[in-house]
Amino acid sequence: MKKTGYFLLAVIVIVAATGVGYWKFSGNPDALREIVLEQCLPDQLQHQNPAPCAEVKPRAGYVVFKDRHGPLQYLLMPTYRINGTESPLLLEPATPNFFWLAWQARGYMSKKYGHDIPDSAVSLAINSRLGRSQDHLHIHISCIRPDVREQLDNDLTRISTRWLPLPGGLMGHEYLARRVTESELAQRSPFMMLAEEVPEARDHMGRYALAVVRQSDDSFVLLATERNLLTLNRASAEEIQDHSCAILSSR
């Protein structure tokens, strides 16, 4: 009976998880890809106009796009087909360091806001295969939740340069945390750090979500959470973000 109960619970969780989507593009999981490949990229190449994207960099291989959810949220996406965290392309040395590029694009938030936004209020996040509803790699550039910001501030000295469990997790889910310098982040992709340093991660990258947050000592914290349906964790690192940017009103 116990085994049957666990099985039914797992089925319910899977159905619920796959039925929840963040994007509402008429159920089209390729909506973002179509925007990038059929609108932004052609407009830039043919007319030197990135619209509807905010920026298109064909040679560097990425675009920046204003997300319609939240006043300041942007997305960084590749100009070619990469589905998400499960893609082996992310572990190729020639692939752009998309997280570093996303961090460089944070200035779009300040420009939209009309004032400088402190780095401590910004976060980057990418969801797992099950934690997303769009099948084109996209890194969310948005505000961090105030409570997550406070927790990471309190854990500043306890976060190691190795991947270790974050005490207490975040948002009720288990997270691994790793501290890196700005130079490390610029030179090495967080996807590669996760795949090469966390046992068995390389073979199951699609199960993971990743986030990047700046700390008060100018280091960065990499955060990773792995899908676990029995604990209702779809591995959506976007959960540490607040697209309403309440953290800005408290400063």
Curated annotation (Swiss-Prot):
Gene: cdh
Gene Ontology molecular function: any one: CDP-diacylglycerol diphosphatase activity
A GO-annotated cellular component: plasma membrane
Taxonomic source organism: Salmonella paratyphi B (strain ATCC BAA-1250 / SPB7)
Cell location: Cell inner membrane
Catalytic reactions on record: a CDP-1,2-diacyl-sn-glycerol + H2O = a 1,2-diacyl-sn-glycero-3-phosphate + CMP + 2 H(+)
Location, primary (coarse class): membrane
Keywords assigned by UniProt, alphabetized: Cell inner membrane, Cell membrane, Hydrolase, Lipid biosynthesis, Lipid metabolism, Membrane, Phospholipid biosynthesis, Phospholipid metabolism, Transmembrane, Transmembrane helix
Superkingdom classification of source: Bacteria
Pfam families named in the record: CDH
Record's protein name: CDP-diacylglycerol pyrophosphatase
UniProt cross-references to InterPro entries, sorted A to Z: CDP-diacylglyc_Pase, CDP-diacylglyc_Pase_proteobac, HIT-like_sf
NCBIfam families: cdh (TIGR00672), PRK05471.1-5 (NF003986), PRK05471.1-6 (NF003987)
Coiled-coil positions: none
Biological pathway: Phospholipid metabolism; CDP-diacylglycerol degradation; phosphatidate from CDP-diacylglycerol: step 1/1
EC number in record: 3.6.1.26
Stretches that traverse the bilayer: 5-25
Keyword Lipid metabolism attributed: yes
Gene3D superfamilies according to UniProt: HIT family - CDH-like
Topology versus the membrane: Single-pass membrane protein
Assigned protein family: Belongs to the Cdh family.
Gene Ontology biological process: CDP-diacylglycerol catabolic process; phospholipid biosynthetic process
